[in-house]
């Protein structure tokens, strides 16, 4: 294991972990990182009294020309059930490999994104207890905000390029997320 206290680490599989079926049915992500996600539909980690982290596995083997994923309907149902099991004051962070928003000049490629992106994004927006959506996949960093009617906005944070050289228009090397009571603040951190 990478750390002795696996409950302090969450590892979410991405398309590179599940591009193609492995020989002999071996799931290498589960073999090497399974302790950090678990065997259930969701990875759940209670951060504190106000915040719960929910990890989704939307990566699956595809045809060699695609890098897309799918959030299963069973994952959505399990998340609904989880949210319902907590008080209305509890805030949730969903962690998933694939983004739900993109930079303005991004050229969308349906073979590289979530197949069910729009219904998943709409479902999340209809659940105001989900306050933060963390993802990767696109090797650029950004923080987007989606407004909600009569509810706190949804913050969507991509820190997928934490180790790479900054691209034009990027303002952060990675993001620091501060959770105070029911408030969330995202600070861009720039390394020179």
Model region roles, listed by residue range:
Residues 1-81, 86, 119, 150-156, ...:
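Extended active-site neighborhood of metal-dependent phosphoesterases/phosphodiesterases
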Residues 13-23, 61-66, 99-103, 130-148, ...:
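Active-site environment of divalent metal-dependent phosphoester hydrolases
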Residues 179-192:
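A short C-terminal boundary segment appended to hydrolase-like catalytic domains
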Residues 83-104:
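Short acidic, glycine-rich surface-loop motifs adjacent to enzyme active sites
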Residues 67-70, 106-112:
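Short glycine-enriched, charge-decorated loop/helix-capping segments at active-site entrances
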